[in-house]
Amino acid sequence: MIQITVIQIDNYGPWTVTPNPRRESDLQALQSRLYADLNLMFGAHKGLVFYTRFDNLIAITNGIDLITHKRIQESIRNRYPFTVSMVIASAETPYEAQKLATETLQEYGSAQDENRKEVLDVANELVVDGYVQIAHIDINNITGTLTDIVSAYDTYLNVNKVKLALMEELLKYNALLFFIGGDNFMAPSNGMSEEDFLDIFNRINKKYKIELKAGIGIGRTAEDASNLADIGLEKIRGKLVDKNVCTLKQDDFLESKMGMGKIYHPQF
């Protein structure tokens, strides 16, 4: 089971134009700061936040309880000129979890309802003994094939084409995908196999002539899974595996490191 928290700024659209439209540069900076602060706050508890549309964010929050969510919510109220609402849900797949959380939040009223403030609810249950699977996907040799050859905007356009293709393909497996900068994407993907990813990569390569690779991490929290995914991706880059996917599981990884005589102090 994966635990997802949907985060939404309360009544944000009307606030941006009241009493007059606010400077766009200020709004962009404010949204970026909120994303950064939320990642730091949830990250302190081994969670991970993705910005989606900036006024609506999705966080992977396995291991994070309701009290911690409440404290984060209060901290945002104290730091920002607006409030946020949060709903937590769990499911076998990321898409199912975020959908359930979203539907529960919508039951409290519109995102632009001035009377709906600081909703905090659990749609079904908090995850006690679940896991997180995250794939860190990137484009093979984007520097040599795009960055150093075509314009900055054309590279950006191609990256977004790949992003959309990945989002549509992964949705067939009830997985999610988020852009995380450069040519990198992260996909919460509980239940997917390496073969599923290879099939998707082959279809995208046939259509766009772009090769992809992915480290896949499976851990108890978003931080554990994403760290393992990063290590798996480095194994592919270092040609330590013979295919474009590499899966690392938390317990297996810790056992292999301990067996090499290294001392680890995992925080579970």
Swiss-Prot record:
It is an enzyme of class 3 (hydrolase). It catalyses: GTP + 3 H2O = 2-amino-5-formylamino-6-(5-phospho-D-ribosylamino)pyrimidin-4(3H)-one + 2 phosphate + 2 H(+). Keywords: GTP-binding, Hydrolase, Magnesium, Nucleotide-binding. One of its GO terms (molecular function) is GTP binding. InterPro entries: GTP_CycHdrlase_3, Nucleotide_cyclase, Rev_trsase/Diguanyl_cyclase. Its EC number is 3.5.4.29. Its cofactor is Mg(2+). GO terms for biological process: biosynthetic process. Catalyzes the formation of 2-amino-5-formylamino-6-ribofuranosylamino-4(3H)-pyrimidinone ribonucleotide monophosphate and inorganic phosphate from GTP. Also has an independent pyrophosphate phosphohydrolase activity. Homotrimer. Belongs to the archaeal-type GTP cyclohydrolase family. This enzyme couples pyrophosphate hydrolysis to the guanine ring-opening reaction. GTP cyclohydrolase and pyrophosphate phosphoydrolase activities probably occur at independent sites. This is GTP cyclohydrolase III. It comes from Methanocaldococcus jannaschii (strain ATCC 43067 / DSM 2661 / JAL-1 / JCM 10045 / NBRC 100440).
